[in-house]
Amino acid sequence: MSFTDTPEGFRSGFISFVGRPNTGKSTLTNALVGEKIAITANQPETTRHPIRGIVHREDAQIIVVDTPGLHKPRTLLGERLNEVVKDTYADMDLIAITVPADEKIGPGDRWILDAVKKVAPKTPLLGIVTKVDKASRDQVAVQLMELHELLGGNSEVVPVSAVTGEQRDVLLDVITRLLPEGPKFYPDDHITDDDTETRLSELIREAALSGLKDELPHSVAVQIDEILPNDEREGVLDVHAVIYVERPGQKSILIGKDGRRLGRIIHNARPEIIKILGSNVYLDLRIKVLKNWQQDPKQLGRLGF
């Protein structure tokens, strides 16, 4: 039987989580898929390209598209990310507006909703109140009412915690009901359509972002140079990658005193890389300065933006 053979009434489609930076979109994507496919960090604007996570159910296949958060851009990179996001919205079967339970709805949320309605005026909307584990029941109730009022019409609103799993299955049931009937788009063993190098570079970037403050996180980009069998150790893969920053001072911060921070980056990234490659890994990281790459069209193209 082909993976495209589906029972009568089977539903499938693409849903995008939309919201301000740091509303928990990537964490929720991982929770629904059941495996880590999107990196997470305490800094806003971590996601840099649409990541498709695939949820398999007996009655549906849900493709969750985790996009960069819509924001008012300060760099050419920011402008390009916003364009990617808007193009993604136009192709969705369902768009979910996400707001955290522990932060009041404000002008930023309204700006995002207006942007979504301009790009995808006919696409159904779903409201999701995230991070309910961080708020009281009364706070969650107020947020649900305010989000319902913001969306207007007959849009449904669902509370969820990606951390505890509370309401996860309820949310999947609601999403399934709102998707159209259709075929499977991916085989049952696929959880994402990201290529291996992209997943590895994102894991390294996540490890590099840990503990960073101010503007430095936005200046970090990662590129995989090559993945090769180790010449001397059987069953070991050598992963060679470059971390790019914009200034020499940023390079010094990432290397750390006596190379300690760089060592932590390697230590933290290796376990997830080993999971993906299914092999022991020697991770070789170099840090290079690529001056003002966020504003340079040529360098943005080289880095895949």
UniProtKB/Swiss-Prot annotation:
Region (G5): 160-162
Domain Era-type G span(s) in chain numbering: 11-181
Domain KH type-2: 212-291
Region feature (G3): 66-69
Residues annotated for GTP binding in this entry: 19-26, 66-70, 130-133
Locations listed in the record: Cytoplasm; Cell membrane
Membrane topology of the entry: Peripheral membrane protein
Region (G1): 19-26
Keywords of the record: Cell membrane, Cytoplasm, GTP-binding, Membrane, Nucleotide-binding, Ribosome biogenesis, RNA-binding, rRNA-binding
GO CC, alphabetical: cytosol; plasma membrane
Chain spans, region G2: 45-49
Record GO biological process: ribosomal small subunit assembly
UniProt-recorded Gene Ontology molecular function terms: GTP binding; GTPase activity; ribosomal small subunit binding; small ribosomal subunit rRNA binding
Main location as per UniProt: cytoplasm
Region (G4): 130-133
Family: Belongs to the TRAFAC class TrmE-Era-EngA-EngB-Septin-like GTPase superfamily. Era GTPase family.
Subunit organization: Monomer.
NCBIfam families cross-referenced by the UniProt entry: era, PRK00089.1, small_GTP
Role this protein plays: An essential GTPase that binds both GDP and GTP, with rapid nucleotide exchange. Plays a role in 16S rRNA processing and 30S ribosomal subunit biogenesis and possibly also in cell cycle regulation and energy metabolism.
Protein name: GTPase Era
Organism: Corynebacterium diphtheriae (strain ATCC 700971 / NCTC 13129 / Biotype gravis)
Taxon lineage: Bacteria, Bacillati, Actinomycetota, Actinomycetes, Mycobacteriales
Name of encoding gene: era
